[in-house]
Swiss-Prot record:
It holds the Pfam family PGI. This is Glucose-6-phosphate isomerase. CDD domains: SIS_PGI_1 (cd05015), SIS_PGI_2 (cd05016). Pathway: Carbohydrate biosynthesis; gluconeogenesis; Carbohydrate degradation; glycolysis; D-glyceraldehyde 3-phosphate and glycerone phosphate from D-glucose: step 2/4. Catalyzes the reversible isomerization of glucose-6-phosphate to fructose-6-phosphate. It is found in: Cytoplasm. The active site is at E346 (proton donor), H377, K505. InterPro entries: G6P_Isomerase (IPR001672), G6P_Isomerase_C (IPR023096), Phosphoglucose_isomerase_CS (IPR018189), SIS_dom_sf (IPR046348), SIS_PGI_1 (IPR035476), SIS_PGI_2 (IPR035482). The gene is pgi. Disulfide bonds: none annotated. Its EC number is 5.3.1.9.
Amino acid sequence: MLFCDDSKKYLKEQNINLKNEFDKDDKRVEKFSLKHQNIYFDYSKNLINDYILKSLLESAEKSSLKDKIKQMFNGAKINSTEHRAVLHTALRDLSSTPLIVDGQDIRQEVTKEKQRVKELVEKVVSGRWRGFSGKKITDIVNIGIGGSDLGPKMVVRALQPYHCTDLKVHFVSNVDADSLLQALHVVDPETTLFIIASKSFSTEETLLNSISAREWLLDHYEDEKAVANHFVAISSKLDKVKEFGIDLEHCYKMWDWVGGRYSLWSSIGMSIAFAIGYDNFEKLLAGAYSVDKHFKETEFSKNIPVIMALLASYYSCTYNSQSQALLPYDERLCYFVDYLQQADMESNGKSVNIAGETVNYQTGVVLWGGVGTNGQHAFHQLLHQGNIFIPVDFIAIATSHHNYDNHQQALLANCFAQSQALMFGQSYDMVYNELLKSGLNETQAKELAAHKVIPGNRPSTTILLDELSPYSLGALIALYEHKIFVQGVLWEINSYDQWGVELGKKLGKNILKAMNDDSSDEYQNLDDSTRQLIAKVKNK
């Protein structure tokens, strides 16, 4: 049964007024909030009542969600277009029960690879790994893009108070040379270790940056042997890794059953471990595993990722919401929105179902946002007074790592105030009376009042963490991962392929050839607009 069928439209006819719902039900917060260990999930400010929630939960039951959850965790090839299992969860699974994929127990493989990464991290941190000149490594430069960059970069920044290794970790992703140069300007070739993170070892941006980094290193050493002391790889293409000059002993695995946007739990998370130490990296995995268990074992009515997905899908199907705002009120989560944009939009930005049929309902939404309180002085105006329906997720941390309690209290007060303002707003009469009290006459108050009305009744969810630790961050990420999966099930789409990104890559290669040879077939096949753009560049 499709989640987005016509029966969902009538739910809007419930005409939920949040202020009224709170006034008439003093148990509303208790009913519409959940807790998982150190995470409190308050969804009471959403446009739901008992009847709507019951209807949404019934739809989840009818969607075969329970079976799909089992299939994913048991290694079924739910990525149907690429014939792959989806098992990023296996990377953080603490159980020893065999998990067979294509005839192999991947538990053993995962354990072995984790140990290899741990040994590398400890070797570099302890100083036993040395650069070509014999100096200790002081800087790590991670070269990757997409999931090989966004996840690790987000976690390294979020867990900055847990950095404990004296290693500085840098990230290079964009093919724009400025991305690479920013890192190279602050590191020393004799004390830098590069991580090349590319499953295919042919991703254009990563390969070009890696080649340039290699040239930079060899300009200093003038000896090819230096590459082995200053580069490691995470790839499945051993021949290309060896050709680059990297010792295969220092090539770490990427499995087909781990998608790039879900790969920070794998060897791709090596840069995280270099920053926070391997013990803390394991706590990150443990936090995610705790949510995996919650997701697998908890009934839907108390299952946080399921409720998250039901709410988002409900707004998409019933209110035609086309975007979702994500507002973390913690500076350490400044890359969290970027990370989730890929995880969510690359997963569920689809227009055909699993059978390949064009869907007649809305699927993925535009996920956007930024850290509070910055957003309040930028885009919150649209949230409060715009005429676009935008559900909001607030993420707040109860206690911070610093001792500036007055800052933390102000931050949290602003977060809670924003969710309250979205819910209650302020009516014309309220504004008008306030203006009169401020000294305006009746005419002036009437002229200004309409401009200050805030409609309110705009839905939001608040996720409150006790603290931002490796464990709690792992749990938070996993909540959103599973939310994305559930939405894909509800919409009957494949959340684990990303064919939409391939055409641009292909055309980019053709255009690069055309830019270098205007007699080529690639140039002759260009449209007039693209040809003119190339001409403008050449004639600059």
